[in-house]
Design a protein with these regions (language model features):
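Nucleotide-activated donor-binding/catalytic signature segment of Leloir-type glycosyltransferases, i.e.
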Residues: 204-226
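Aromatic "clamp/platform" in nucleotide-sugar-dependent glycosyltransferases that forms part
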Residues: 243
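A charged, aromatic-enriched C-terminal amphipathic alpha-helix characteristic of glycosyltransferases
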Residues: 17, 301-328
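Membrane-proximal helix-turn-helix segments that form the acceptor-binding/catalytic region
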Residues: 90-109
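Short hydrophobic beta-strand element within catalytic cores of glycosyltransferases
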Residues: 260-263
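Glycosyltransferase donor-sugar binding loop
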Residues: 136, 167, 190-205
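Conserved acidic donor-binding segment of nucleotide-sugar-dependent glycosyltransferases
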Residues: 275-286, 293-299
Length: 332
């Protein structure tokens, strides 16, 4: 069996969570010895399409006419499109209609969580929908004290500094405004945000947040995977202040690095993240502040070993087997 992993604008998307998810797919298929190509002109048995762009839609239509089987990967929903870029809320209903048009071309649809599956079903999509996590590369994200020290050295943090990390594009949905507010309220802590997107496309509130000047706040921009791993090992707490996700890859990576974390209590995490069991959860800035202080002071016990089980369940080999089962189901 040979799979076409197709993603238009791959270079542009490479710096996003979607780009990371596609790399994970490649590693997952390698882990279970499934051959793949990224060139639609090559011979292949089944197409796995990762994006909702016009090129992807046209390719899917063309392959359907040729009798090829298609797996469409639903990484995006109307819900996680909202509160992202300028005018995203105004056009979200049109975006949803377009997603439905694309996704329903699949003989099967893959989406990362039960939550995103329910959203797709609420759109009226009747195609078979399979839940497969985006997964994590355990060999690239692991507990590494040396990597943590390198992170602190690289960004001029002292050994005694208490560091809070956030990761994501410059969009409101990712909780970047709350991250800046936490930095304002917690001047004794160091806050550093990794990730970047052009501010020209960001909403006014986000631009204001990113341009905030505080002695304890750093916007480090886009960095490579190695630096993210170092940061997750070198920080005291990783916070996922996101308001909406289809999964949240960085949470799985933080779990793999055995990083203390606080995540927002939102529906996508129901069923696999549990407050006080494998992560700590918060609903607003005040609760994030309290949880961070209690983790750093030791009032709250560390849950990193319990969180690691999340990553272990989502390692490449397991994801590869699930992808293989979906492909075989379409081809048989």
């Amino acid at each position: 069996m040979k799979v076409l992993l197709y993603t238009e604008n791959e270079k542009i998307l490479s710096k996003s969570g979607l780009g990371k998810a596609i790399k994970h797919q490649m590693n997952a298929l390698k882990a279970v010895n499934i051959e793949y190509t990224t060139n639609p002109k090559d011979d292949f048995d089944i197409a796995h399409i990762n994006f909702y762009g016009l090129k992807s839609y046209r390719l899917a239509k063309k392959l359907k006419k040729q009798g090829k089987k298609i797996v469409y990967h639903a990484h995006s929903t109307e819900e996680d499109f909202r509160n992202s870029f300028i005018f995203s809320n105004q056009v979200s209903k049109l975006f949803k209609k377009w997603l439905i048009k694309c996704y329903t071309l699949g003989d099967a649809i893959i989406t990362p969580t039960e939550y995103s599956k329910k959203l797709l079903q609420s759109y009226g999509i009747k195609n078979d929908i399979y839940v497969v996590s985006n997964g994590v590369e355990l060999k690239n994200f692991g507990h590494d004290e040396k990597a943590g020290r390198e992170f602190r050295k690289k960004y001029n943090f002292k050994k005694e500094d208490k560091i809070i990390v956030g990761i994501g594009l410059y969009i409101e949905r990712k909780g970047i405004i709350d991250f800046v507010e936490l930095a304002k309220q917690m001047p004794k802590y160091k806050f550093i945000w990794f990730g970047y997107s052009p501010l020209i496309f960001s909403r006014k509130k986000v631009r204001k947040a990113v341009n905030t000047k505080l002695n304890n706040l750093t916007f480090a921009g886009y960095v490579e995977q190695e630096t993210i791993c170092q940061a997750l090992n070198g920080c005291d707490v990783y916070i996922a202040a996101t308001y909406e996700e289809t999964e949240g890859i960085t949470i799985i990576e933080a779990a793999s690095c055995k990083t203390n974390m606080v995540v927002r209590d939102i529906p996508v995490f129901n069923g696999w993240l549990e407050n006080g069991k494998n992560v700590y959860m918060a609903r607003n800035v005040s609760e994030f502040k309290n949880k961070i202080e209690e983790i750093v002071s030791g009032e709250l016990p560390s849950l990193v070993q319990e969180a690691y089980n999340i990553a272990e369940e989502r390692k490449s080999e397991n994801i590869g087997e699930k992808l293989k089962n979906v492909y075989q189901g379409c081809l048989n």
